[in-house]
A protein has these predicted regions:
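Transmembrane alpha-helices
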Residues: 125, 129, 162-195
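Q-loop/switch helix immediately C-terminal to the Walker
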Residues: 344-360
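Helix-to-loop junction immediately C-terminal to a conserved catalytic motif
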Residues: 316
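Hydrophobic anchor residue at the start of the ABC signature
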Residues: 391
């Protein structure tokens, strides 16, 4: 690994030497120090400047203005993007301002602000106006791109806002924020220094560039350009280091999302009264009447495509039925047809989000998964392993009613038997309803009441 790092630095050094050579050749071809100076002449000018107090005052004066403008723009953009995501009216109110910021040239803003405020805070304002719309729009787009299925899962399992943000919204935001910050960091330095050249405030790089232009001091101009590049690169490295730490951080989930007391020993009854659901003019099911009692699993015994998944969604509140009602139960947990796991995180972390205890999550998952799979990102697990993780999450959540939609998909005979034994062991006095095309084995079927509902899937 150290060898690869060394090769990487050598490669970068060679690339730097190449561009210095191009610069040197260009200066020799032009042969006019008023137009292009050599790298050595620029270095001499930089060393001369570095010995002056004014140089450091100008460098740090510009640095704090540009950093302040960037931070103000970024923080406000992140906050207002979150508000706009939550409240549509906020997005509509801000839309004209975003169009205005994107369409009006920076030079126009610079002249107007110079007239209104003077030059001292011009660079701060210009950096703000460049950074704000870019980060706002990308953040809002990232929030909107969050996986709808994962958000439904979070709603069912009652995940806290903190957990939803870090493990659902944050991965969705990552590509958008990285792109927005990379573009904004470069633009804020270019626009900030340009604003200083226009306003020429005291102790600023822009003011020094303006003086170098007046006195035709090209070497000093190149020296200040090198300073801008160094400051810009260093600032970008610091910001992206902080961003990388933020995206790598996996905060612990310290409290159960759904307190275990909800699954009491008292046997509850789920009442389904004259339930009906349709899409457009077609009834998926209609006139479904049933009571489900705790302590004994039920299996939906209906043909494929008859609406079992939609029925589950109506039971747990993800779909609103056209007719009837569901009552008697406050909390549901669901194993969806899709696994709906946070793919960037391990099986242990996915269960920890619900249980609030990483050690307990590891202990439980070890019953159905091999040890080496527990800490792998879920995207690297096989389909059968993911299915078992989603099964454990549904069974351990502590809900009064557990809905399992195709829990045995992707499982071989041995793992299916383990899953059936686990379901039977964990069912307790809760209501447990399964929808599966794979008939449960003997271990589970001894306690299964097969259910055929008249007209289920054939409503009119």
């Amino acid at each position: 690994m150290m060898q690869n790092k060394g090769k990487k630095y050598v490669k970068k050094f060679i690339i730097l030497l190449f561009w210095l050579a191009v610069w040197q050749i260009l200066a020799m071809c032009v042969d006019n120090f008023l137009l292009v100076v050599t790298p050595l002449q620029a270095l001499r000018a930089l060393l001369t400047l570095a010995g002056q107090a004014e140089f450091w005052q100008s460098a740090f004066g510009s640095l704090w203005r540009i950093v302040l403008g960037f931070l103000l723009g970024a923080v406000l953009a992140l906050f207002l993007a979150a508000v706009s995501y939550r409240y549509k009216i906020a997005e509509e109110v801000l839309q004209p301002f975003m169009v205005f910021c994107k369409a009006v040239p920076v030079a126009v803003f610079a002249v107007l602000l110079l007239i209104w405020w003077g030059s001292s805070m011009l660079a701060v304002a210009i950096c703000f106006l460049v950074v704000f719309p870019n980060i706002y729009l990308n953040t809002l787009e990232g929030l909107k791109s969050a996986d709808r299925e994962l958000l439904e899962m979070a709603e069912i399992f009652r995940l806290s806002f903190r957990t939803r943000f870090f493990y659902i919204y944050r991965p969705a935001l990552k590509p958008f924020l990285l792109s927005a910050f990379q573009l904004s960091l470069g633009m804020c330095w270019k626009s900030g220094v340009a604003a200083e050249v226009i306003g020429t405030p005291a102790h600023s790089i822009g003011g020094a560039l303006y003086l170098a232009k007046i006195y035709l001091d090209t070497a000093e101009l190149f020296a200040w350009t090198a300073v801008i590049i160094v400051l810009s690169v260093c600032f970008e490295k610091i910001i992206f280091y902080g961003i990388s730490l933020f995206f790598r951080w996996e905060p612990a989930c310290k409290r159960p999302a759904m307190p275990q007391k909800t699954a009491t020993r008292e046997r509850r009854t789920l009442r389904v009264g004259d339930l009906g659901k349709k899409y457009h003019d077609h009834w998926i099911f209609r006139h479904v009447e049933r009571e489900f009692h705790g302590g004994e699993p039920y299996v939906l015994d209906t043909p494929s495509g008859s609406g079992k998944t939609t029925f589950f969604r109506c039971l747990c509140g993800l779909e609103r039925p056209e007719e009837g009602e569901v009552s008697g139960i406050d909390t549901f947990s669901v194993q969806f047809q899709e696994d709906r796991l946070c793919e960037d995180y391990s099986a242990v972390k996915n269960l920890e989000m619900v249980l609030g205890d990483a050690a307990l999550a590891r202990e439980i998952l070890a019953q159905l998964l091999p040890e080496e799979a527990l800490d792998q990102p879920c995207r690297e697990l096989s389909g059968g392993m993911k299915r078992r993780v989603s099964l454990v999450r549904a069974m351990e959540a502590g809900a009064q009613c557990v809905l399992l939609d195709e829990p045995f998909t992707g499982l071989d005979e041995e793992n299916r038997k383990k899953a059936e034994a686990y379901i039977r062991r964990k069912a307790g006095g809760r209501i447990l309803i399964l929808a599966t095309h794979i008939r449960p084995g003997e271990e589970l079927s001894q306690t299964v009441r097969m259910w055929e509902v008249q007209d289920f899937g054939h409503g009119s």
